[in-house]
């Protein structure tokens, strides 16, 4: 049984979720991110615009659409470059390095790969919206996503999986959660200062929020991931591989998620009374992300639905 997660703060959703959803689908079509009609149907039932609306409920309309477009791009390329394809192919390294090059050079390569122009579009708009330093917070998270994908691939190519501790290190970066959290202040009261953002207590809050999203996803996506061809080790699967039953593994991960929620809230309540208005907004934005992701899974998306495992888990036949 897949557990539910409760939070000591309320849900929220941007009032323009439907517009963000329509805009994200149009963005994907415009940039050639939709390989087939069946894939279009998958995107429609996944509802990435609603994820943006729940995670950034107070964003202005420009940032909301930007995040919705970024989400639909990210999930598509993450599935087709890493998760739902063969563990390693001749395209893996060129695809991932092209994404880093867009960040480093701010231009497409000589022979752009699938999704590269869409990624440049997202980055160009984010650069215009954010300060240079703020954009680099986001960019660092994306560089780490592409780089740690190599560690994730190496783990799946080995004779056995690594244990949970090194898996946690890989997971917090391959998830793509950190770049999303780096935008939490932009969606509230404006950017926190570099000193605030990089301070140990604030980075500890970011770590707790990241763990909540990643580890809860590991139980919610478990059935889908166990059927993926290239990437199938997650926290629950590793615990089960080490001797627990699958349900015991799920329950243990859920217990750890609840511990992270409690630790986040305890630290946040200590920090907030003395924080600046932007920092209070950032902390609240982290709350929106944790709760918003859970509400999206429970109410909106069919990304992890049992009914679509056979259809969605394996993208090795998708041509890009």
Swiss-Prot record:
One of its GO terms (biological process) is terpenoid biosynthetic process. InterPro entries: Isoprenoid_synthase_dom_sf (IPR008949), Terpene_cyclase-like_2 (IPR034686). Belongs to the terpene synthase family. PANTHER family: BETA-PINACENE SYNTHASE-RELATED (PTHR35201:SF4), TERPENE SYNTHASE (PTHR35201). The lineage of its organism: Bacteria, Bacillati, Actinomycetota, Actinomycetes, Kitasatosporales. Keywords: Lyase, Magnesium, Metal-binding. The record marks 75 as: Plays a critical role in the stabilization of intermediate cation. One of its GO terms (molecular function) is metal ion binding. It comes from Kitasatospora setae (strain ATCC 33774 / DSM 43861 / JCM 3304 / KCC A-0304 / NBRC 14216 / KM-6054). A motif (DDXXXD motif) lies at residues 78-83. Its cofactor is Mg(2+). Its EC number is 4.2.3.163, 4.2.3.171. Signal peptide: none annotated. Mg(2+) 3 binds at residues 217, 221, 225. Mg(2+) 1 binds at residues 78, 83. It catalyses: (2E,6E)-farnesyl diphosphate + H2O = (+)-corvol ether B + diphosphate; (2E,6E)-farnesyl diphosphate + H2O = (+)-corvol ether A + diphosphate. Pathway: Secondary metabolite biosynthesis; terpenoid biosynthesis. Substrate binds at residue 171. Mg(2+) 2 binds at residue 83. It is an enzyme of class 4 (lyase). The record marks 79 as: Plays a critical role for substrate recognition. The keyword Magnesium applies. This is (+)-corvol ether B synthase/(+)-corvol ether A synthase ((2E,6E)-farnesyl diphosphate cyclizing). The Asp-Asp-Xaa-Xaa-Xaa-Asp (DDXXXD) motif is important for the catalytic activity, presumably through binding to Mg(2+).
């Amino acid at each position: 049984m897949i557990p539910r997660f409760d939070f000591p703060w309320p849900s929220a959703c941007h009032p323009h979720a439907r517009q963000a959803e329509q805009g994200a689908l149009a963005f994907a079509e415009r940039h050639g991110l939709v390989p087939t009609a069946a894939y279009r149907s998958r995107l429609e039932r996944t509802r990435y615009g609603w994820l943006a609306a729940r995670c950034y409920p107070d964003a202005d309309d420009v940032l909301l659409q930007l995040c919705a477009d970024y989400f639909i791009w990210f999930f598509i390329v993450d599935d087709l470059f890493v998760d739902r394809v063969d563990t390693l192919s001749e395209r893996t390294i060129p695809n991932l390095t092209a994404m880093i090059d867009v960040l480093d050079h701010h231009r497409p390569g000589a022979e752009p790969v699938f999704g590269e122009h869409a990624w440049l579009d997202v980055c160009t708009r984010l650069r215009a919206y954010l300060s240079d330093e703020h954009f680099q917070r986001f960019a660092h998270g994306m560089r780490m996503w592409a780089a740690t994908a190599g560690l994730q691939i190496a783990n799946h190519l080995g004779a056995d999986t690594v244990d949970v501790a090194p898996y946690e290190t890989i997971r917090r970066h391959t998830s793509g959660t950190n770049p999303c959290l780096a935008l939490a202040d932009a969606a509230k009261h404006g950017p926190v200062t570099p000193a605030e953002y990089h301070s140990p207590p604030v980075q500890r809050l970011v770590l707790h929020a990241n763990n909540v999203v990643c580890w809860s996803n590991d139980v919610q996506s478990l059935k889908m991931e166990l059927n993926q061809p290239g990437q199938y080790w997650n926290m629950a699967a590793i615990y089960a591989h080490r001797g627990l039953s699958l349900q015991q593994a799920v329950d243990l991960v859920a217990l750890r998620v609840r511990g992270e929620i409690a630790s986040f809230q305890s630290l946040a309540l200590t920090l907030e009374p003395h924080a600046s208005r932007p920092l209070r907004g950032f902390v609240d934005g982290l709350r929106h992300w944790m709760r918003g992701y859970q509400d999206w899974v429970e109410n909106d998306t069919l990304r992890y639905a049992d009914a679509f495992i056979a259809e969605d888990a394996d993208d090795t036949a998708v041509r890009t």
